[in-house]
Amino acid sequence: MTNRIVLAYSGGLDTTVAIPYLKKMIDGEVIAVSLDLGQGGENMDNVRQRALDAGAAESIVVDAKDEFAEEYCLPTIKANGMYMKQYPLVSAISRPLIVKHLVEAGKQFNGTHVAHGCTGKGNDQVRFEVGFMDTDPNLEIIAPARDFAWTRDKAIAFAEENNVPIEQSVKSPFSIDQNVWGRAIETGYLEDLWNAPTKDIYAYTEDPALGNAPDEVIISFEGGKPVSIDGRPVSVLQAIEELNRRAGAQGVGRLDMVEDRLVGIKSREIYEAPGAIALIKAHEALEDVTIERELARYKRGVDARWAEEVYDGLWFGPLKRSLDAFIDSTQEHVTGDIRMVLHAGSITINGRRSSHSLYDFNLATYDTGDTFDQTLAKGFVQLHGLSSKIANKRDREAGNN
């Protein structure tokens, strides 16, 4: 049986050099798989050809933008998915989709191994490998950058010794990962927590201080899904792309945070996610109007746990599936419109309307037309505070308060 390695191929130096390296290591063929997740930049046909030129037996490019938006970004919107209340899981939600297509390619080409280019210090090694274990445990996993101390210098030396066609350029000091949902920047001078990020690291967002005129936008949802912007029907992908442009032009969606990595270390990360942040903020605002108080309280805890599961690489796990089912059940009435102003790096919600709204004007108003029966409040207050009152009485008598 021929050994076949299915490689998560980015088109960069490391995974290009990995093709001939892996071929030699297992004496077999390499199937390179690349996904277009809306990351922009290089033409994907060029990426495909580079893999073939490096010696791949097959090079597959998958246009997965709509699939990514509908099946990975949309659940993140419904879950208000923010790890540590800030990070909208830009890289974390893309890894299970890459895993899915690598496993499919493994079945198509009778793959025996699967490989990725992650190091041993990051979260992505976990996301990839747990995903492979969950979906096809028969594939043997190879991680050359981690397992064989693969460095950039070693990669270039191997390429020169083996005539691998690579384009050497001045190396960016940063590690960058991007897709339509956002952009992640790390390492380089950012590893010193006191160093402020310079303007040149940003690509999805303009400087919030530019003074652009405010941009007012209306985002409409049906069952928690964005369906139109300013009255124009959009797909989820189109909604993300348009808000990337509009919110990005206002400097919305920049994050600078110290993140608790799964492997136990803290890491400074810079993110740009204008469309993601705008959609999640709008969705949260609509949930405030349409979800009952106790359910909303409980969902906030579920949302946080969902983000942790996804961040930790457990997309295919049983808890994540159960959390998905709960979250989906909460979205039945999350239908309506949110109006927001994008300006100078901020989002201001200034309008909400929904045919499923739980806001009752006549109960909320303090003016004429008030239907709230305030005579019921006194008894409610007494009963609400009764258990606390009894406990404090006991503690006072015991001299503890």
UniProtKB/Swiss-Prot annotation:
Q: Which reaction does it catalyse?
A: L-citrulline + L-aspartate + ATP = 2-(N(omega)-L-arginino)succinate + AMP + diphosphate + H(+)
Instruction: Identify the metabolic or biological route this protein is part of.
Output: Amino-acid biosynthesis; L-arginine biosynthesis; L-arginine from L-ornithine and carbamoyl phosphate: step 2/3
Its GO biological process annotations read: argininosuccinate metabolic process; L-arginine biosynthetic process; urea cycle
The entry's L-citrulline-binding residues are 87, 123, 127, 175, 259, 271
Q: List its EC numbers.
A: 6.3.4.5
Q: Where does L-aspartate bind?
A: 119, 123-124
Keyword terms, alphabetized: Amino-acid biosynthesis, Arginine biosynthesis, ATP-binding, Cytoplasm, Ligase, Nucleotide-binding
Q: Could you tell me which PROSITE patterns the record lists for this protein? A: ARGININOSUCCIN_SYN_1 (PS00564), ARGININOSUCCIN_SYN_2 (PS00565)
This chain's protein is named Argininosuccinate synthase
